Amino acid sequence: MTVITEANKTKARELTAQLTLDEKIAIVHAAGLFRNGNAERLGIPPLRMDDGPMGVRAELHNDNWAPLYNTRDYVTYLPSGSAVASTWNPDLARMTGEVLGEEARGRGKDVILGPSINIKRSPLCGRNFEYMSEDPVLTAAQGVAYIQGVQESDVAACAKHYAVNSQETDRLDVDETVSERALREIYLPAFEAAVQDGGVLSVMGAYNLVNGTKCCEHKQLLDDILRDEYGFDGFVVSDWSAVRDTKASAEVGMDIELSVTPNFDDYYFANPLKKAVEDGDVKE
């Protein structure tokens, strides 16, 4: 299974020290629908991402959600998250992840954007089929097995959507007001297990707000809990166009801004981030 070693970290630090500001900026925002930029000079390729969690998504155009109709493209359709969790069988969850990881690697993907380990709270949520359970213990157990299966093939799993993203209605702006106890006992255990037991390599920041702060700008969630408390040393990506403030997101450990726009200037982590660094508002 893919793990981040001290040797990996040393190499990453050495490469980072050689990057120009423009190369750093290219890497931290999308350069297409499912990939970020690269640093060709140093041999750093883009991360090629794709949706799970119910099978690798068929190939799409680089700058929109339209399928490539001129390809004979077939993928394996896998059980939904709710079906996987309903087995109460970690071995089957891991097997599902293994199939997904093998197919993703065979198609040249580096990251699978799943599993979805949000807690089901409303029967009206349009993505409940994708989430595993209303039970944080079951979600954690099945999510860990799923992640381990995916990462057997040197493909990074991405635990999403962090955090408290349990409804689709007004998901871009809804403010989820939640007590510390409920946060710790209901909404975060699956993410904690994903990091500490599953070794998940990536986490996706959600659209919604938690107690008045957007998830992709949330110091408590991203820095204090995810990195400092759980020990997460992978990378955090935003949900599509979930970054709304350059400085706020950059300062709390948002690593890659994802979106679909082909316009470089439309990314908060593109020219606005470069200017913020040059002006001294954000540390390079």
Q: Can you say where each PLM-predicted feature lies in the sequence?
A:
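Glycoside hydrolase catalytic-domain context in secreted enzymes
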Residues: M1-E284
